[in-house]
Amino acid sequence: TLHQTKKGLVAALEHGRRECRGQYIARLDADDIALPGRLDHQIAALDTDPSLAAVGGRATLFTDHGPVPRGMQYYIDWINNLDDPHREILVESPLLHPAVTFRATHVEHIGGYRSGEVPEDYDLWLRLVADGFRIANVAHEVVSIRDHSSRLTRTDSRYSRTAFDSCRRNFLQKTALLRPRRIVLWAGVRGGRPWLRWLKTGGHQVIAVIDITKSIVRSGVPVLPPAALPDLDLDILLVAVGARGARGQIRNELATLRPDLVEGHNWWALL
């Protein structure tokens, strides 16, 4: 057991990480339960693929009192059915922090956890991938997570929508948007406005907004229906539509309208 004065979560994570001497480091919150076989499955994955930096897995969720909140269960269901964390890395954090085992050298290479107004785990996964490393989930339940109202994800500003968007934008700036691009933004008014503003401020040419509304122009950018996509000369498509089920519908439409676009390569869902 390691002891230090109270300095916050990131300081504790970094203190523990630096004291570790093994090749791999496994995370677990004190009130969660590691399931039998967790380390066997994750270490086997890491041993097999040296490019893997971090490996998570499936999870179950429980509470001490009352039902599991619907939003958290929806997130766990998404994780448990996630085929490719890289493909949907900008939707949400694709690895559950308490379920992760990571390669010590790769995390050290990018400087470990960072403090600041960002979710420290999501920020870490994104920086690993931006630096060329891979992440994955094993197809096994590896942890049972205790959900409660005092979780930092519900009470700390580092886990706000704004903080997550900051991580997404930092990732895009280091990867797909490293230089000015011709971008199409598929988004409604509410979800799209901050992204449209950010893209234009960054010097990117937003050639169209895709929406089913009857708007003609939004912030100087033409608003077009999905049927217009085949005729657009674009580099990157960003999708900021948060309605439940919309992501799958849009994915299906894109397979027909723009089969040349590959999710996680030149188009991303942001919600």
Write out the residue ranges for each language-model feature:
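Short beta-strand segments
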Residues: 56-58, 185-186, 211, 240
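Nucleotide-sugar donor-binding/catalytic module of glycosyltransferases
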Residues: 1-156
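Catalytic core of nucleotide-sugar-dependent glycosyltransferases
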Residues: 140-141, 145-148, 153-179
